Amino acid sequence: MKLHELKPAEGSRKVRNRVGRGTSSGNGKTSGRGQKGQKARSGGGVRLGFEGGQTPLFRRMPKRGFSNINAKEYALVNLDQLNVFEDGTEVTPVVLKEAGIVRAEKSGVKILGNGELTKKLSVKAAKFSKSAEAAITAKGGSIEVI
């Protein structure tokens, strides 16, 4: 085998279909757009969700609920994520952000009880679940709501 004998694998390089280049190509004349009509024109076509003038599905369905502008969204942290810290560390939202455990503090940090805590930590957060509170104090750590 020589360099000039190298060829790409069968079917690995598909030839681009050039439309509107003669009838024998199979996509000449109307370029695969059929005859006249909205979809045959340049820039033609209907918008997303258009159903031909019939009331579209999204307008037939009733509206429901609302978004509470006063809702608080907490950054959630589970107990097993706190095991990255050394024994006796004071864990605050700023420390959690620096460690890359939370991206943004949002309305504060809430500690949840999923997983197992193996270290004695002093944790400061906006909220604690009951199971997280129990697990932290059981390991001899302390909690503080800020």
Curated annotation (Swiss-Prot):
One term of GO molecular function: rRNA binding
Domain of life: Bacteria
Ranges of compositional bias, category Basic and acidic residues: 1-13
Ranges where the record places region Disordered: 1-59
GO CC annotation terms, alphabetical: cytosolic large ribosomal subunit
A biological process term (GO) from this entry: translation
Compositional bias annotation for Gly residues: 23-35, 42-52
One Pfam assignment: Ribosomal_L27A
Keywords in alphabetical order: Ribonucleoprotein, Ribosomal protein, RNA-binding, rRNA-binding
InterPro entries: Ribosomal_uL15, Ribosomal_uL15/eL18, Ribosomal_uL15/eL18_sf, Ribosomal_uL15_bac-type, Ribosomal_uL15_CS
Family affiliation: Belongs to the universal ribosomal protein uL15 family.
Function: Binds to the 23S rRNA.
Subunit annotation: Part of the 50S ribosomal subunit.
Annotated protein name in UniProt: Large ribosomal subunit protein uL15
Biological source species: Streptococcus agalactiae serotype V (strain ATCC BAA-611 / 2603 V/R)
